[in-house]
């Protein structure tokens, strides 16, 4: 009995280790895509709208889960900020979108809810969370809802691309 149990535990450990390594590799590639595509942003007020971030948030939400999505969004935002291609406002927008989109997909397994979760998480929650950062840390004058429209526009652009890309990836069982 002990031998069978130990064999089971070893197989389970190897399988979990393989899954973790795969997820880390995918997250690394998504972070690299986010950093390399950073010049593809457009300024709206104090923010730099970056639809590619929302595309990779949705890919991470669907294929990696909310935990990896949030960590990936944080690292991408940090690297974009360090290279001068992002702002502090990227943190709440990308991380809230990845979290809400990831949780929506994790509990429903429905792609449309991942898309809506990303839009809501970034466009509403992330935009409202960006307000104190803009006002108190960046010293910008802004109304409470000033970032909602730019964040929704940015998120919608990435979501439209993600609809086609994630659907294709799901159909090919990637």
Which functions belong to the PLM regions below?
Residues 1-174:
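Loop-helix junctions at membrane interfaces
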């Amino acid at each position: 009995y002990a031998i069978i149990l130990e064999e089971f535990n070893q197989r389970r450990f190897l399988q979990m280790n393989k899954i973790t390594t795969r997820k880390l590799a995918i997250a690394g590639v998504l972070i690299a895509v986010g950093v390399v595509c950073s010049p593809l942003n457009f300024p709206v007020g104090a923010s730099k709208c970056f639809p590619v971030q929302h595309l990779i948030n949705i890919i991470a939400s669907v294929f990696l889960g909310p935990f990896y999505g949030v960590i990936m969004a944080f690292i991408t935002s940090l690297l974009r900020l360090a290279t001068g291609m992002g702002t502090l406002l990227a943190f709440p927008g990308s991380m809230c979108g990845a979290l809400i989109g990831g949780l929506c997909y994790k509990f429903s397994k429905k792609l449309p809810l991942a898309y809506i979760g990303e839009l809501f998480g970034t466009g509403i929650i992330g935009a409202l969370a960006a307000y104190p950062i803009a006002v108190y840390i960046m010293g910008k004058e802004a109304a409470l809802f000033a970032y909602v429209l730019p964040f929704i526009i940015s998120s919608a652009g990435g979501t439209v691309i993600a609809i086609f890309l994630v659907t294709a990836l799901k159909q090919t069982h990637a």
